[in-house]
Amino acid sequence: MIGLADCNNFYCSCERVFRPDLVGKPVVVLSNNDGCIIARSEEAKALGYKMGDPFYQVKEKLEAEGVAIFSSNYTLYGSLSNRVMSMLSHYSPHIDQYSIDESFFEVDYSMAKSFFETDHSMAERFFKEYPKENVTSATADSLLHQYGARISADVLQAVGLPISIGIAETKTLAKIGSKFAKKYKGYQGCCLIDTDERRRKALSLFPVEDVWGIGRQIARKLDYMGIRTAAQFADKKESWVRSHFNITTVRTWKELNGESCISIEELPQKKSICTSRSFADEGITDKNVIEEAVANFAVRCTEKLRRQGSVCQGITVFAWTSRFNESVPEYTIHDSLTLPIATNAQDEIVGAALTILRARYPKPMADSRPDRPGMSFNFKKAGVILWQISPDNPRQQDLFDPIDRSKQKALMEAIDAINRKNGYGTIRQAIQGTDCQFDLKREYMSKRFTTNINEILKVKTQ
């Protein structure tokens, strides 16, 4: 069986962990530069706020209705995500993190039975008083449900984040189960789809456009064909599905019918890695600051690259001015290069990114100030994309490579270890700067309670 643990309204729930006064109250989280709404609590959804609502359009309404507003605090979210994933690893030997707030895991009856017999839940390590289930006579299905419900309760107790768990024969069905567990409290945090009867009932109640793997275009095509529920799609013959859709959709159809086509390890590596940012206010006009920003984006990309055990050979850099401000000239930078040898070393990738940027950066305009060359262009967004990604081991070697790759790899591992322990940017390249002049506009950001000693939560006692 495959389980999926999905954190409920993750960003909003993270903000509530250190603000218990917000439990039961509407909360929204904003995108980079406080641009639009990207996360909503259930209470905020009930008030009618939508994903992507521009903040400037709903700001007054949010304030009038007493909605708690937060800027994105990715440091906090990443830290709490790591805690959840660490806890999940104690309940299953095979964990496959799908996103910051979702993770697949393997589960079976013997695993659940062994867990309850030893009764070694993570929550009990931190809390002396914790209810113990009597499962000596539990059937296989009820035991699996209790196991999932226990994981959900333990994570809430120890980390403070509510999670919903779906358990089924396939990843796609587990996804559907987690949606039901999130929507209906009667499931106690876990929905088990382990029989054909339960599968068919779940699919009959689930919109086909919400099925994992069914995109908007395919959903529109299915709707045109009169297929609105997952059950209607699953009931079609395989030959019909193959004649109308691609192999990916056929795999989704098989998964809905209980045939596992996506194993725990099979989720593909990213074909490209991108780090980009929109700049606040009027943008950036200083070439040195743009270079600093691009260097930081390149470093972030290399960290992601090393984290998934990959190397890349292609690099793209882009930057552009505002398309909506007619008072300043428009300019776009977008160029790529291919490295002779695939790498994940940040010094090589940062150097290549800066080479692209400097080659395409606009020359000073005739009417620009002599002491601030190139200041007539206000760049509103920039980013770095890594492509031609392949596994780090094995990697294609070059007989005449002047770099000692073993020493380079050891250096990158040391830098990553130090930065993980002491915080991002503890060791950085000089070109990255120290004052983040290109930093995001985050007027509503909460503190980094779990990673910054100066922002740790203080509790007053009498």
What spans do the regions from the language model cover?
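Short Gly/Ser/Thr- and Asp/Glu-enriched loop/turn motifs at secondary-structure junctions
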Residues: 98-102, 168-171, 310-314, 377-381
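Acidic, metal-coordinating catalytic segment for phosphate/diphosphate chemistry
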Residues: 338-462
